[in-house]
Amino acid sequence: MADLQRFLQDRCLGVSNLPQKGRSLFTARDFRPGEVILSQKPYICVPNNTSSESRCDGCFKTNNLKKCSACQVVWYCGSSCQKSEWKLHRDECKALTRLEKEKRKFVTPTIRLMVRLYIKRNLQNEKVLPITTTDNYSLVEALVSHMSEIDEKQMLLYAQMANLVNLILQFPSVDLREIAENFSKFSCNAHSICDSELRPQGIGLFPLVSIINHSCSPNAVLVFEEQMAVVRAMDNISKDSEITISYIETAGSTLTRQKSLKEQYLFHCQCARCSNFGKPHDIEESAILEGYRCANEKCTGFLLRDPEEKGFVCQKCLLLRSKEEVKKLASDLKTVSEKAPTSPSAEDKQAAIELYKTIEKLQVKLYHSFSIPLMRTREKLLKMLMDVEIWREALNYCRLIVPVYQRVYPATHPLIGLQFYTQGKLEWLLGETKEAVSSLIKAFDILRISHGISTPFMKELSAKLEEARAEASYKQLALH
């Protein structure tokens, strides 16, 4: 671990042990917003292949794929990716080929990740693959597993998964309990590898990044450049500060966030935001994000439960909303929501759009205008409307979502930047060039912090902005 400390010191970082948190990453100098704090290639990674979509094992692209003729599990986009993956896939391929064809469909991305973990460990031990300071199995061994906190049901699932891995590998030296413990490590430490627009493409293990602890109001952000994990500062971070990222979706009440962290990561968050639990600001925030709207449609107040249990009282205009009215709306909403498809097929999109609009109307009557459920419905509608190329309506929804994002996320959160980017592209497409320039500038100002300025994604955004500016100038001149 001395090598690791030196590696981190060279990057003005250090690891300290904190009570309740364990290993934590600290700065040894000031970092400015947008500065890269740490980057790491995955120790192992696999794409999220499904029955409807496959990805290249090397680059995660989806175009022009060919299946490995031997194992029939892995896909490649060409010989370059196949060659780069061959040392690892050669042994994996043999192992998968031994498995009955019918059982290969049970090889999920997580199972493959575990198979690759042991194959890579063996290849590094045999010196077929190099061992480096940041790419070695000892970093995986140092990860926390939380095995003592796992319930019996989850332990049984890990045991079943470990049996399948053992059946695939057939390594005499591998212990089933160790495999189960590593599955627990995956649950707490593996990261979804996302594209520049934060869409999940695969999963990977980044042991250095896993040293970074969670906060619901983090000072850094994790993004991916292809499969490289890159951690950038979101704020000005002073020397000797702890680096934190968010492990979960932070839009939600303290109770919702705590529940999510406990279920997935098995810890109770004590960050600055969570320490406000039960205080007036936290109660207001929860009521806005997950509570009901005022009975007066023109009022923007939030509702709290009436002490006499008659309903909910608006904290702005003091109007009472009856329990019966809320219950009836919630029941109607539940009935309609149960009919809504999670991922409608292309031919069902129009019907799905109408159904989600009905859900939206009921949510507008029931929830606060900044509520998370309403925001999620509008996100779905935006995506579906863009899929069927109903651009004007898509733009309207985009404009409804942006203010909610600005309310629920920090100012430099990449999701706000990406939403402005979508808005700018839609405005430009619909001939609203001046508005498009404004939206694209806002997108660039946020995304340069999370994504840097030299990535292909940001170069494309920059080019679009320049083109839109030129078009706006031309239109302005044409008016004179």
Swiss-Prot record:
Q: What reaction(s) does this enzyme catalyze?
A: L-lysyl-[histone] + S-adenosyl-L-methionine = N(6)-methyl-L-lysyl-[histone] + S-adenosyl-L-homocysteine + H(+)
GO molecular function terms noted in the UniProt entry: histone methyltransferase activity; zinc ion binding
Q: Which compartment or compartments is the protein found in?
A: Nucleus; Chromosome
Organism equals Arabidopsis thaliana
Which InterPro entries does the record match to this protein? H3K4_H4K5_MeTrfase, SET_dom, SET_dom_sf, TPR-like_helical_dom_sf, Znf_MYND
EC number assigned by the record:
2.1.1.-
Positions binding Zn(2+) 1 in this chain are: C56, C59, C77, C81
List the SMART domains hit by this protein, alphabetically.
SET
Q: What is this protein called?
A: Histone-lysine N-methyltransferase ASHR1
Q: Which gene encodes it?
A: ASHR1
**What GO CC annotations are associated with the protein?**
chromosome; nucleus
| This protein's record includes keyword Mitochondrion | no
User: Which annotated residues bind Zn(2+) 2?
Assistant: C68, C71, H89, C93
Q: Which Pfam families match?
A: SET, zf-MYND
Which family is this sequence assigned to? Belongs to the class V-like SAM-binding methyltransferase superfamily. Histone-lysine methyltransferase family. SET2 subfamily.
As for what it does, the entry says:
Histone methyltransferase.
Q: Which Gene3D superfamilies match?
A: 1.10.220.160, 6.10.140.2220, SET domain, Tetratricopeptide repeat domain
- Tell me the SUPFAM superfamilies matching this sequence: SET domain
For biological process, the GO terms are: methylation
Q: Where are the zinc fingers (MYND-type)?
A: 56-93
